[in-house]
């Protein structure tokens, strides 16, 4: 199916099959479509609402074309990632949580990018922390094997995305591509926490990941609108485990934590996010640093559970709490900076 035929179908509010979507996505990602066609396709899909079959087709093509990171084993390797677009401008919770996971001995293959609508994307934060981002897939694998954590800079692994960059930027709206990033981890992880910008996406994206072979995934959205677990409100979870999907709400109190406002956790820049994370991961914390630490513990705990590194969400949160307060997570961030600095010298020689 070509993109013109697909547009005719979409205008008629008809869904594409998985295979038809694969054909259209391959044309988009290999530069066979004009920017006008891509923009029309993305808007048409949004107006119609993307089906599970369509998302599966799009994800499978992006995964196929990605520059992959080959790991010795994917057992218990986890990614904690959000779609962004929640408008809250909270500090980089998922990225900070990743260092707690690594300090707990749980390997992390973190996939992320620069901010699109927010103040600080994961790549922006890590760059502010002095971590070199432009790694080869082999270098990322060496980071994960040696340190238990590596960062995959999305634009380095999904170069085919460049064909859709112009239309996405000019539309300035959330499109299908906002959902695809968290579903296209270049290391092919089977364990994830995926935060989404709307509760209505939780179940569908859990079903997409089920069809694509994921093992244990939590797809989450909090009642106060975050694409992660919140301290200030219940969080809705669609959990894929043992090839079954269950849906439920989680309150901070269910996990042994106290509900509190998120006041003081919004940031205006990657540097401000880094300062708050340094405060949160350090041994002596300000009031905002303590609150940020609890937000990190909540989300790192969920990822420890998704990685099967803890038997329950509550056990994951307890482990994350213990690890964060050792100060080892901040040391892990500094180790990654030193480790990638060597690769920077190699790559720029």
From Swiss-Prot:
Q: Could you tell me which Pfam families the record lists for this protein?
A: Glycos_trans_3N, Glycos_transf_3
Cellular component terms per the entry's GO annotation: cytosol
Q: Where does anthranilate 2 bind?
A: 168
Look up the coiled coil feature and give its residue ranges. Answer: none
Q: How is the cofactor bound?
A: Binds 2 magnesium ions per monomer.
Its EC top class is transferase
Q: Which SUPFAM superfamilies match?
A: Nucleoside phosphorylase/phosphoribosyltransferase catalytic domain (SSF52418), Nucleoside phosphorylase/phosphoribosyltransferase N-terminal domain (SSF47648)
Q: Which of this chain's residues are annotated to bind anthranilate 1?
A: 82, 113
> What cofactor does this one take?
Mg(2+)
- Quote the EC number: 2.4.2.18
Alphabetical list of PANTHER family matching this protein: ANTHRANILATE PHOSPHORIBOSYLTRANSFERASE
Q: Which family does it belong to?
A: Belongs to the anthranilate phosphoribosyltransferase family.
Q: Quaternary state and partners of this protein?
A: Homodimer.
Task: Kindly provide the name given to this protein in its UniProt entry.
Answer: Anthranilate phosphoribosyltransferase
Q: What is the species listed in this Swiss-Prot or TrEMBL entry?
A: Pseudomonas putida (strain ATCC 47054 / DSM 6125 / CFBP 8728 / NCIMB 11950 / KT2440)
> What is this protein's gene name?
trpD
């Amino acid at each position: 199916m070509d993109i013109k035929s697909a547009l005719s179908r979409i205008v008629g509010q008809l869904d594409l099959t998985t295979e038809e979507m694969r054909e259209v996505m391959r044309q988009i990602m290999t530069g066979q479509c004009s920017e006008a066609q891509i923009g029309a396709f993305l808007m048409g899909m949004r107006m119609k609402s993307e089906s599970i079959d369509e998302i599966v087709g799009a994800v499978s093509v992006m995964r196929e074309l990605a520059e992959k990171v080959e790991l010795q084993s994917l057992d218990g390797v986890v990614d904690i990632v959000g779609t962004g677009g929640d408008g809250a401008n909270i500090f980089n919770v998922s990225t900070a949580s990743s260092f707690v996971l690594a300090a707990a001995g749980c390997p992390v293959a973190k996939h992320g990018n620069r901010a699109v609508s927010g103040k600080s994307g994961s790549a922006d934060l890590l760059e502010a922390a002095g971590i070199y981002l432009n790694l080869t897939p082999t270098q990322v694998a060496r980071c994960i094997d040696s340190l238990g954590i590596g960062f995959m800079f999305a634009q380095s692994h999904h170069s085919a995305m460049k064909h859709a960059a112009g239309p996405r930027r000019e539309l300035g709206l959330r499109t299908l591509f906002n959902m695809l990033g968290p579903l296209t981890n270049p290391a092919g992880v089977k364990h994830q926490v995926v935060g989404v910008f709307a509760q209505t996406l939780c179940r569908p994206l859990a079903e997409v990941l089920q069809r694509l072979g994921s093992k244990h995934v939590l797809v989450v959205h909090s009642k106060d609108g975050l694409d992660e677990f919140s301290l200030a409100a219940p969080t809705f979870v669609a959990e894929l485990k043992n090839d079954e999907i269950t849906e439920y709400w989680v309150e901070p109190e269910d996990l042994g934590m106290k509900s509190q406002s998120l006041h003081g956790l919004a940031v205006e820049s990657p540097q401000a996010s880094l300062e708050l994370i340094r405060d949160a991961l350090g041994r002596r914390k300000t009031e905002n640093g303590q609150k940020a630490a609890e937000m990190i513990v909540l989300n790192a705990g969920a990822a420890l559970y998704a990685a099967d590194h803890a038997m329950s969400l509550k056990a994951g949160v307890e482990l994350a709490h213990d690890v964060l307060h050792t100060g080892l997570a901040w040391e892990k961030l500094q180790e990654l900076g030193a480790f990638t600095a060597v690769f920077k010298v190699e790559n720029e020689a």
